[in-house]
C-alpha cells in the first residue's frame, strides 16, 4: 500500500476515533468533577462531614465501577449489530440489558443500604458511622436510575452517538452544585443535612440523567431504527446470561484495577500523614490524566465492534492499532509534562514542602507508567469490541494482584531485598503490574485479531 494511502487511512481512523472519544472524555471529566464538588462543599461544612463523604465514596465508587463494568457488555453487542446493519436486533437486546440494569442497580442499592458492617470492620470512628451511612443510603437511592442510564448510554455509544452522555454529564455537574447547596444547608424548607445532603444531590442528579437520556433516546431520529420503545418484553434469561458472560469479566477487571489503588492507599496509611497526602495528590492527578486513554479505550470498543459487525476484521485490527497509537502519543505528552512539572503539579494541591517532595517523587513513577497504562486500557477496550473479556479479566487479575501488589509490598514494606522504600516501592509495584498487564493484553489482542481474520479467510 502506498505511504500516502496508508497515512490517509490512519488520519481517517484517528478522526473517527476522536469524534467518538472527545465527548466521552468530557463526560468522564464531568463525572469526576462531581466527586470533587462534593468533597469541597462537604469540607466547608465541617471536617466530620468531609470525612463522612470520603468514607462513603470509598465504598460506593468501587461498587459503582463493578456495576457499570457489568453493563458495559451492552456496547460491543450493540456496535456489532449496528455494523452488520441489523438495527432491528438492537432494540430487543437493549430491552434485556435494561432488565439486567434494574436487577444489578437494585442489588447494588441494597448492598450500599446495608454497608454499615463494612465501616465497622474498617474500625471507623463511631461518630462518623451515622453520617457516612446517611450519605451512602442517600446515594443508594439513585443506583437503579444510574444503572438504567448507563445501559442507555452504552446503547447510544454503540451506535456511535457519544454526544448525549457529554451533554448530560455537563448539565448534571451544573445541577449538582445548587442541589448540594440546597440539601447541605437546608434551603426551600428542607432540613440542613450537611454531608448527607451531598448524597441526596448525587441521587437526584442520577435520576435527572436517566430522564434526560430517556427523552434523548426516545425522540432523537438517529435511534428510531432500533425501535427500543416499540414493545414491552419480559426478561429473557438466555439473552441476559449472554450479557453477563461478557459483562461480569469486564466488571471484575475494572474493579480489580480500581481496588488495587485502594489497597495501596490502606498500606500507605501507616506511614504517616505526609506520605498519605503525597500519595493522594499523585493518585488524584494520575486519575485525571487517565481519563483520556480510558475514553480512547471506550471509543476503541465501538470502532472495533462496528468493524467486526460489517465483516471487516482487518479494519477492526486497524482501528485497535490506531487507538493504541493515539493513546501512546498522548502518553508521551503527559509523561513529559509530569516529569518536567512534577513539583508545580504538587504545588497546586498544597503549600507544604514535605508533602510536595513526596508527591513529586511519586509523580515520577506515575509518568513512567503512562505508557503501559495507555496500552493496557486501550487494548482492554479493543478486546471488549471483540467480546473477548474472560481471559482479559484473568490477565488483569494476575498482573495487578499476582505481580504488581506483591512486588510493591516486597519493595515498599518488607526488608527482603534491603531496606523498605515505603511509598516509592509500592508505586514501583504499580509500574511493574501495569507493564505486565500492557504486555499480556497487547499479546491477547493480537491473537484475537488474527483469529477473527482467519475465520473470514
Stretches found by the model and what they are:
Residues 1-21, 78-144, 190-248, 304-369, ...:
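Short alpha-helical transmembrane segments in multi-pass integral membrane proteins
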Residues 19-38, 138, 142, 149, ...:
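Transmembrane helical elements of multi-pass membrane transporters/channels
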Residues 25, 29, 33, 37, ...:
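Generic alpha-helical transmembrane segments of integral inner-membrane proteins
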Residues 29-51, 119-126, 182-193, 251, ...:
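Helix-terminus/linker motif at the lipid-water interface of multi-pass membrane proteins
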Residues 47-58, 136, 199, 273-288, ...:
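Small-residue hotspots at the loop-to-helix junctions and early N-terminal turns
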Residues 50-109, 113, 146-165, 278-342, ...:
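Small-residue-rich hydrophobic transmembrane alpha-helices
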Residues 68-71, 75, 139-157, 165-173, ...:
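Short runs within selected transmembrane alpha-helices of multi-pass transporters and secretion channels
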Amino acid at each position: 500500500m502506498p505511504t500516502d494511502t496508508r497515512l490517509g487511512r490512519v488520519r481517517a481512523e484517528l478522526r473517527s476515533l476522536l469524534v467518538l472519544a472527545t465527548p466521552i472524555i468530557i463526560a468522564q471529566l464531568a463525572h469526576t468533577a462531581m466527586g470533587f464538588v462534593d468533597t469541597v462543599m462537604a469540607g466547608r461544612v465541617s471536617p466530620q462531614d468531609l470525612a463522612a463523604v470520603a468514607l462513603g465514596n470509598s465504598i460506593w465508587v468501587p461498587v459503582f465501577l463493578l456495576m457499570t463494568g457489568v453493563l458495559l457488555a451492552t456496547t460491543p453487542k450493540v456496535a456489532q449489530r449496528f455494523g452488520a446493519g441489523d438495527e432491528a436486533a438492537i432494540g430487543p437486546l437493549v430491552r434485556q440489558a435494561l432488565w439486567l440494569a434494574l436487577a444489578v442497580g437494585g442489588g447494588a442499592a441494597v448492598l450500599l443500604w446495608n454497608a454499615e458492617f463494612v465501616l465497622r470492620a474498617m474500625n471507623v470512628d463511631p461518630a462518623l458511622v451515622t453520617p457516612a451511612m446517611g450519605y451512602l443510603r442517600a446515594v443508594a437511592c439513585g443506583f437503579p436510575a444510574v444503572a438504567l442510564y448507563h445501559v442507555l448510554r452504552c446503547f447510544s455509544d454503540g451506535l456511535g452517538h457519544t454526544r448525549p452522555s457529554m451533554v448530560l454529564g455537563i448539565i448534571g455537574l451544573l445541577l449538582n452544585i445548587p442541589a448540594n447547596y440546597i440539601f447541605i444547608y437546608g434551603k426551600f424548607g428542607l432540613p440542613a443535612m450537611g454531608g448527607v445532603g451531598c448524597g441526596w444531590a448525587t441521587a437526584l442528579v442520577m435520576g435527572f440523567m436517566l430522564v434526560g437520556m430517556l427523552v434523548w433516546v426516545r425522540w432523537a431520529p438517529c435511534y428510531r431504527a432500533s425501535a427500543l420503545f416499540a414493545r414491552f418484553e419480559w426478561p429473557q434469561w438466555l439473552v441476559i446470561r449472554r450479557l453477563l458472560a461478557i459483562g461480569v469479566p469486564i466488571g471484575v477487571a475494572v474493579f480489580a484495577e480500581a481496588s488495587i489503588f485502594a489497597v495501596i492507599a490502606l498500606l500507605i496509611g501507616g506511614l504517616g500523614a505526609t506520605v498519605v497526602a503525597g500519595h493522594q495528590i499523585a493518585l488524584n492527578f494520575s486519575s485525571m490524566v487517565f481519563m483520556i486513554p480510558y475514553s480512547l479505550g471506550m471509543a476503541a470498543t465501538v470502532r472495533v465492534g462496528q468493524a467486526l459487525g460489517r465483516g471487516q476484521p482487518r479494519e477492526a485490527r486497524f482501528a485497535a492499532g490506531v487507538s493504541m497509537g493515539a493513546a501512546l502519543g498522548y502518553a508521551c505528552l503527559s509523561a513529559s509534562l509530569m516529569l518536567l512539572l512534577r513539583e508545580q503539579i504538587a504545588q497546586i494541591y498544597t503549600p507544604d514542602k514535605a508533602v510536595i517532595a513526596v508527591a513529586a517523587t511519586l509523580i515520577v513513577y506515575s509518568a513512567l507508567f503512562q505508557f503501559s497504562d495507555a496500552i493496557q486500557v486501550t487494548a482492554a477496550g479493543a478486546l471488549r469490541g471483540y467480546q473477548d473479556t474472560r481471559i482479559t479479566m484473568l490477565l488483569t487479575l494476575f498482573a495487578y494482584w499476582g505481580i504488581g501488589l506483591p512486588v510493591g509490598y516486597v519493595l515498599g514494606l518488607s526488608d527482603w531485598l534491603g531496606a523498605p522504600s515505603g511509598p516509592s516501592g509500592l508505586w514501583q509495584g504499580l509500574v511493574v503490574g501495569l507493564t505486565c498487564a500492557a504486555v499480556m493484553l497487547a499479546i491477547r489482542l493480537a491473537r484475537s485479531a488474527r483469529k477473527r481474520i482467519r475465520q473470514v479467510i
